[in-house]
A protein has these predicted regions:
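Acidic (Asp/Glu-rich) sequence patches and key acidic residues
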Residues: 1-150
Length: 150
């Protein structure tokens, strides 16, 4: 399960030099010949990766995907990410797993609120808090997308 961030970086002739982006893709310290950097219009970053974090996946299905679990990509607003941070923080602090219960499914791994469950929640809080702070501090952010993959 992935949370990615897409940032628009298209260079336009009408932009002031200080507003233009430059993205260069190197391999082995040299620019790749098969990628024209002037045509790059978007940068996609992997913000989070969860492996078998079924409670978090269920949260996205219920709160972002309108209950539809179809492995498609869904846009996630920053306010929703903050809701997830707040919820995960509360569960880690109180150990009340009824707030974000583990889910069943053949592809989901453990349905116990074990050490891995709490590690996933703590990692989610740490990484998403850092990402949202970065967005706020730079006053620029991209668009976030969640996608499950089995």
């Amino acid at each position: 399960m992935y949370l990615s961030k897409r940032t628009y970086v298209k260079r336009w002739d009408h932009q002031k030099p200080e507003s233009r982006h430059e993205v260069i893709v190197n391999r082995g310290g040299k620019p790749r010949g098969d990628i024209d950097s002037s045509r790059i219009s978007e940068v996609i970053e992997e913000v989070m990766y969860w492996r078998k974090a079924n409670a978090i996946h269920s949260w996205f299905v219920q709160n972002v995907q309108d209950g539809v679990d179809d492995c498609k990509e869904y846009w996630v607003g920053e306010e929703k990410l903050q809701e997830l941070i707040d919820l995960c923080s509360k569960v880690v602090e109180t150990k009340d797993t009824t707030l974000l219960p583990p889910q069943t499914g053949f592809f989901f791994g453990s349905q116990e609120a074990d050490d891995w469950y709490f590690i996933d929640l703590a990692d989610t809080v740490k990484n998403l808090t850092k990402e949202l702070e970065l967005c706020r501090n730079t006053k620029s952010s991209g668009d976030f997308y969640y996608q499950a993959s089995w």
